Amino acid sequence: MAVTMADITKLRKMSGAGMMDCKKALTESDGDIEKAMEIIRKKGQAIAAKRSDREAAEGCVLAKKDGEFAAIIALKCETDFVAKNEDFVALTQAILDAAVANKCRTLDEVKALPMGKGTIQEAVTDRSGITGEKMELDGYCVVEGAYTTVYNHMGKNQLCTIAAFNKESEEAAHNIVMQIAAMNPIAIDEAGVPESVKEKEIQVAIEKTKAEQVQKAVEAALKKAGINPSHVDSEAHMESNMDKGWITAEDVAKAKEIIATVSAEKAANLPQQMIENIAKGRLGKFLKEVCLLNQEDIMDGKKTVRETMKEIDPELQILAFKRFTLRAE
């Protein structure tokens, strides 16, 4: 049976495959559209399998709400060209629509939903085969509450945020999802920050404070000996500054002795209570930066998010939020 241009065009619209692939599939199936579709699907699955070890760093991130339920999903691919393709964005939207309509709470539930003649996962695999790029679903997260809101940062499908509240407040809700997008908090308040994170931060703060105290003592001792600390702060600088004639070999030897002696003495005699107090202050600063309600309001730098919410509605509470981006931060 001869393959017509009308059949090729029809198959291309149905499958999204290229003209030549459609022609080959129709020729192989003797003009049978359904069989040609299956040939294209199988070929696409084989191509997708070969690309499974590639990195999918680009993609499309979308968010949607339906009453008390809101979700984010990302369909990832390899190139920005595919990520901005209308069919790719439409597929991402269709997947999100299905996920929200079915109130899916896990990515596995989303993948198992029906789409076309198979599942959503199979639809993604089919599209991967057609484009020749690795594709995978990622970033699926949900929030639930009396009122939900979503935000797609600058409409670029790269960063989305969602949040749930105990009651409706459109103005506050919109400002907060923008705040989450801009400031990337890890918790609503201090209670939501895992103890393991707090413990890690306090240890980092303690070690940093100790190092700073030792460094101050070393610099003071070097200056007292008539040596510029910046000239001897590394082996490379010592060599370079000797070549320039800024310091002598004797200066370097003396500096090394001072650095070793003072560092050891200061480290052994650091005031523990002072170190802990400084570290606690740094932990407090960290918690202010990573807790949403403690953050400086991006819309009004003179207030915290908590203060702004209280002004808008004293009874308003944020129950949960999620944020997903394809970009490293």
Swiss-Prot record:
Keyword DNA damage: no
A GO-annotated cellular component: cytoplasm
Domain of life of the native organism: Bacteria
PROSITE patterns for the chain: EF_TS_1, EF_TS_2
Principal subcellular localization: cytoplasm
Function: Associates with the EF-Tu.GDP complex and induces the exchange of GDP to GTP. It remains bound to the aminoacyl-tRNA.EF-Tu.GTP complex up to the GTP hydrolysis stage on the ribosome.
Record's protein name: Elongation factor Ts
Protein source organism: Parabacteroides distasonis (strain ATCC 8503 / DSM 20701 / CIP 104284 / JCM 5825 / NCTC 11152)
The gene coding this protein: tsf
